[in-house]
Amino acid sequence: HQGKTYLDEKDDGFAVFAKKIQTVGSIPDTETLEVARQWVANLRDKKQFFLGMNLQNTHYSYYLSEEAEMPFQPMREFEGLFGAWPRKNMEIVRNRYLNAFYNVDKLIENFVLFLKEEQIWDDCLFMVVGDNGEAFYEHGYPNHAGPMHDEVTRTFALIKHPEKSNIKPATISFPVSH
């Protein structure tokens, strides 16, 4: 990656870990999606390809760009480590998390619009899968750094089949694994 990355220097745990393994941090999702957009636009064969991305803005400390919308309030900067931020900041941290999701949802929507412009959307299998949930002290710990409770293990999966597929859309509300 040639663009900018971010690393929350206030989070000593991840900052120290990243320095030890000599990585520079996370790539903002806007840049990840722009690289994906350019890659797809330059494909010769837009009928058969695989693209996998790992979006990071919804991971602690919930990256928000300067242009990000913040409908969930109150919300401000806060100090704290992954898995060890002060309980008194729970509402602020949760709102930052929700704002990060709100903005990532808009980024994914824009990527879907791009796939439609490229005439790829109707024929593609498109999946969005969460890697973990997030806790906000419901069971005495934050983030996903403690015991396995629903808050940290329950996540989502969205699967959009190609239009010509014979698979019928469904909403599944019971636990499954991926």
PLM features per residue range, with description:
Residues 1-77:
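Active-site-proximal alpha/beta segments of enzymes that process anionic O-linked groups
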Residues 67, 116-165:
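Histidine-centered active-site microenvironments of extracellular/periplasmic hydrolases
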Residues 27, 91-104, 147-153, 165-178:
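A short beta-strand-to-alpha-helix junction
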Residues 18-20, 91, 139-142, 167-169:
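Short acidic, glycine/proline-rich loop/turn micro-motifs
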Residues 31-43, 75-126:
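A long, amphipathic alpha-helix that forms part
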Residues 50-57, 98-101, 125-130, 158-159:
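Short beta-strand segments
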Residues 1, 20, 159, 172-177:
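Glycogenin-like
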Residues 48, 58-61, 156, 162, ...:
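Proline-centered helix-kink/hinge sites
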